[in-house]
Regions:
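Nucleotide/phosphate-binding catalytic cleft detector across ATP-hydrolyzing
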Residues: 1-49, 77, 88-135, 156-159, ...
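Glycine-rich phosphate-binding loops at beta-strand->alpha-helix junctions
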Residues: 4-5, 103-106, 161-185
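Short hydrophobic/aromatic-enriched beta-strand-loop microsegments
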Residues: 26, 69-71, 189-194
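Gly/Thr-rich phosphate-binding beta-strand-loop-beta motif of the actin/hexokinase/Hsp70
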Residues: 38-69, 84, 216
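Acidic-glycine-rich active-site phosphate/pyrophosphate-binding loop
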Residues: 52-60, 183-195
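Short glycine-rich, Thr/Ser-proximal phosphate-binding strand/loop in the N-terminal lobe
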Residues: 67-79
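Feature representing long, continuous alpha-helical segments
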Residues: 82, 132, 136, 140-147, ...
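Phosphate/pyrophosphate-binding loops at sites that engage ATP/ADP/AMP, CoA/4′-phosphopantetheine
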Residues: 146, 150-164
Length: 258
């Protein structure tokens, strides 16, 4: 049984409907991501999927080929960014860019002696800070996150059943040192999960940031049903799809500019 806020689900459906589309199904984020990044052997032997996004970290445990436990933690990439902004006294957008470009979840992996330009708040001049200083801010928050995941696994009773270990995915999982720090904390194999996609633009799509989106496509393809109206899904001409997109942007962005 999976529970969630009805109003949140309804808001998502309304957004899709306003774009001229219909919603076939609602899929739990962890299940969608699992379609993109997990192997059937992993699900059978036992694996924990940790999807680290911006606002939340979503956990799913699979054993014997089925999902056994899910949880959502309120700590993720946005909290890391906020820590950087506060500790280094830099704007939030700059903190996000510093995290993505120079961040490391392990201080020991940050190049010693390398300095980075750090914007200041307001009209103050930018400063130069060591990359190790940035890592000093990031590591404690990521460690806290992994310890919370570990506590959730122990509470669920599935920690000892993860035969293939942990799979990290999501946009925030790409941070340098995430896998190394996770292995230190969980004491089991850890890998970065990227979508198993080999089609056009695979060099772009094979990115952990797109795990949920690609997983939704794979879920929909695998669970196609003849009772859904074909004209709306899969066979709509590109001109119709882009036409609806153009109308949506014209309507909503046009209103904002007025």
């Amino acid at each position: 049984i999976i529970t969630g806020a009805v109003s949140a689900a309804q808001n998502i459906v309304k957004c899709i409907t306003r774009c001229g589309l219909e919603v076939e199904d609602m899929v739990l984020e962890q299940i969608a991501s699992s379609y993109a990044v997990l192997d059937e052997d992993e699900k059978e032997l036992g694996v924990c999927l940790v999807d680290i996004g911006g606002g939340t970290t979503d956990i799913a445990v699979f054993t014997d080929g089925a999902i056994r436990h899910t949880a959502v933690l309120p700590i993720a990439g946005d909290q890391v960014t906020n820590d950087i902004a506060v500790a280094l006294r830099t704007p939030t957008q700059a903190a996000e860019e510093l995290k993505k470009k120079y961040g490391s979840a392990l201080v020991q992996l940050a190049p010693e002696g390398e300095m980075i330009d750090t914007p200041s708040v307001g009209e103050r001049a930018p400063r130069k800070l060591a990359r190790t200083t940035l890592a000093d801010v990031i590591e404690p928050r990521v460690e806290e996150l992994f310890l919370l995941v570990q506590a959730e696994l122990r509470r669920s009773g599935f920690e000892e059943l993860l035969g293939t270990g942990i799979v990290l995915t999501g946009g925030s999982a790409k941070l340098t040192g995430m896998v190394d720090l996770a292995e230190e904390i969980f004491h089991m194999p850890v890998r970065l999960g990227v979508p198993k996609y080999v089609g056009a633009l695979s060099d772009v799509v094979r990115n952990s940031s797109f795990s949920t989106a690609i997983g939704l496509l794979m879920f929909g393809h695998r669970h196609q049903s003849n009772h859904y109206p074909k004209r709306r899904f899969g066979v709509s001409p590109p001109s119709a799809i882009f036409g609806r997109m153009k109308q949506w942007f014209s309507r909503h962005l046009g209103e904002e500019s007025q």
